[in-house]
Amino acid sequence: KKLVDTQGALTGVRNDVALAGLNHKLGWRGTTNTLLNFGEGTFPVGQGGYDGKGSGAVGYLVGQPGKGLQCMFHMMNEARIGVGMAATMLGMAGYYASLDYARNRPQGRPMGVGGKDASQPQVAIIEHADVKRMLLAQKSYCEGALALELYCARLVDEHHTAGGATADDARLLLEVLTPIAKSWPSEW
């Protein structure tokens, strides 16, 4: 929003960057994803700006010329795996809360040879077949997602520490698995 000098101190000069909107997205809802307009003259920069009309946003080169997007994706790939890991952990927390509830919530009577026995005490809902099925499905999704996230973390380590073909194989596999590691746990 405000420009900084070479020492990182605020100059008080407003950069010509304006919020155009918020994107709807999958993943961390608390981390916003925005559309920005640069250099449209909404906040004129200096005496006449960079185009002589007051518009122009100040930006900084990331990486080598023509390689900035590549640098950004390199940084974001591990963050995308982190989003998937966070979604996995939320799913695991939900599973453990569901499991605890199912173990402690009594409802219904046990089935005997002649059907339900009203003289027997109620059983926990974890004893019901449909509740068991739902808990097992929840556990399967969570543990499968965790296995995928841990495998991706291992591939990141191999990509950074292994040499030659092993590092290249890990990188190629990560290119395929990273979008899945983010989206699949976030969706389910």
For the regions a language model picked out, list residue spans one by one.
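Internal glycine-rich alpha/beta core junctions
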Residues: 1-188
